Amino acid sequence: MALPKRSPRLRPDREERRRVARLLNELGMAALVPEDDFSRDVGASVLERAILSRADVDLVFVSVESWGIATEFGQFHTDPRIASKLRVLVDPEHHPLHDPRDGYLKDLYLPHLAAYGHVYAVDGGRMVRVPSKESLVLLMAERYRQLKRSQPNLIR
C-alpha cells in the first residue's frame, strides 16, 4: 500500500501519513510514505509509477489537495496497472456527489467514481450534501455510458 504525497503547503500531513503508515505496519500491512521510502536519485514521477504499478501493491491512497496531486491522480487514473488500486480522498467541496457545482475537479473524479467506485469525501466533522438515490443513479449511469463510449479501456 502506498500513501502518495499531499501538497507541500500542508506539511503536518506528512506526519499524518507517517502515523497512518505506522498503524498499517502494526497491522501487518506494508505501507510506504514517498518522502521516506522512495529514492531521491530517481524522479518521483518515474519511481512512483514503477512502484505503484507492481502486482504486490494492492491499494494506493491519494489525497488530492493541490493541482500537482490532481495531476498525479489524473496520470494514475489513466494507467490501468494503477487505476483499480486507487482510493481517492477529497474534500467534500470537491466530491462529485456532495457538491452541486460543476468544475474541473468534479469532472476529474466522476469518471474514476463511475469506473471504479473509489472516491471518498473526507474531513471529519463537516456536514455534506447527500444525493438522492435517483440523482446518484442517473449521474453514475450517464458518466458510465460516456466512459464506455469514449474510454472503454477504463471499464472492466
In which residue ranges do the predicted regions lie?
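Conserved catalytic or regulatory cores that recognize and/or transform ribose-phosphate-containing ligands
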Residues: 1-156
